[in-house]
């Protein structure tokens, strides 16, 4: 189960699911790629068996991630099998020499994110507020439950405007997308927004905007583009 949806930024009810499964023999895996380092408190209080995380979402190095397995009792771990075979590194689950530099970078990024999470999220919230200020006057819908949304992502449908036209309008200054990076090469409608039951016109007009606490871009130019977009909304 996703911790945070990669297209809308909405957090999923992992604590409720974990509690519901705690008394069963079901193994619970959380893909925490989007939420780790941002919503660590919910991960600490959730009952899970497996947790997937990655470094580059924390500002750490690319090419390193981790699968955390929780023990049930002293010895019992969730039963997993390797996808690659060769050496017996990492208890035989993943062959190959451990990339020490990447591991160290991952560890430091995780430590800093945990320590500075509140500060980082406050900075991201300010960016989100600035973006929404620039979009005032436009006819749009924010997709996803904003009460449970990370302040690092906006999924917005502009009424009466195709997303491709918006991409072309802002491409020289801003990098918008119509989905998460893992689906950026797909021209099919967003399966996430489709599953949410959005009408076709909102799906076609949806753009995804994301940022981090490092984002220091000048958003004033966005107003110029939104003025031209408003002619079609």
Regions found by a protein language model. Give the residues of each.
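Active-site phosphate-binding strand-loop segment of PLP-dependent enzymes
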Residues: 1-37
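Short loop segments at secondary-structure junctions
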Residues: 70-74, 159-161, 214
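A short beta-alpha structural unit
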Residues: 141-159, 212-214
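Conserved C-terminal alpha-helix-loop-beta "cap" of PLP-dependent enzymes
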Residues: 154-208
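PLP-dependent enzyme catalytic core of the Aspartate aminotransferase-like
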Residues: 190-233
